[in-house]
Amino acid sequence: AKAADTKVDYVPGWPAIEQIDGNMTFGIGMKVEASKGNILGARLSDVTVVIPDFESHEEILLVKGLAQGPTSEFFRFLDQSPVGASIDRFTEGMKATGNGSLSLELDIPLRHSLDTKVRGDYRFVNNQLEPVSALPPLTQVNGRLQITEKSVQAQDITGRVFGGALKVQVNNVGDKVGVVATGTANIAEVSKHFAFPLTEHLSGSAAWKADISIRKRNADFVIESDLLGVSSPLPAPLNKIATAPLALRIERSAPEAMREQYRITLGQVAQGLILR
């Protein structure tokens, strides 16, 4: 049978697949093969929905599909599905500009859908992302994000921030999502966002590493750099030539009062605490 503008609301709690055009066949089970469809505004292609055996005591609904569309819709899919709760709403409120593609597979036991298995692979294509308000937007983002019913991981996401390139790894542990980022930063660009005291007197670029822990849309992070490539004309002990290393450590935490707290350590030279 032909399916035209059909809706498959496959299991409670998951966004429905709509506007399906394709073929439906019935036998001991059901199979829907669709050339197109829609899920939360994202275009679907090569969609397959299968119930292998209606009479099985463990009926399984298998859903496979490819989607292309705005990254913001992919984040909304995560938020509105049970995956969102498993990763502590990691993408809730995250802003995205640009498109991408999703390969998705769902194995849904119809009698106990809480045991649904998810395998998803999302590919960012030259996106701009705003993960959390404490950090500047990431631009020219490319790479892949893998999701399951319990996890989110990424090993090869690249982009730009603070005027330099960066590479990002993502992995959730328990109710926290951990992000490790490495890159280079232009001091002038850092000053535009953070406006720390004295940064307007510095010049140059340096490599950095950040360990970020995100929980309930709040980010704690530690940023470290040896400041090689950065120079300072300030009086001693804050003067520095670009070829001399000087360990910088910035720790950010948000107390219960939601005031941002930055603890800054500059080698053996200086320490400071900034509240915003």
What annotation goes with each model-predicted range?
Residues 1-3, 20-22, 28-32, 140-147, ...:
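Extended, hydrophobic alpha-helical segments in both membrane/secreted and soluble proteins
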Residues 1-8, 24, 29, 54-117, ...:
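Extended amphipathic, helix-rich lipid-handling scaffolds
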Residues 12-14, 41-43, 132-135, 161-165, ...:
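Solvent-exposed loop/turn segments connecting transmembrane beta-strands
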Residues 16, 38-41, 160-162, 174, ...:
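Short, surface-exposed beta-strand-loop junctions and turns on beta-sheet-rich folds
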Residues 17-21, 60, 101, 138-142, ...:
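Transmembrane beta-barrel architecture of outer membranes
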Residues 32-34, 44-46, 154, 259-261:
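Hydrophobic residues on conserved beta-strands that form the core of alpha/beta folds
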Residues 34-39, 156-160, 262-268:
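Short beta-strand segments that buttress and anchor functional surface loops
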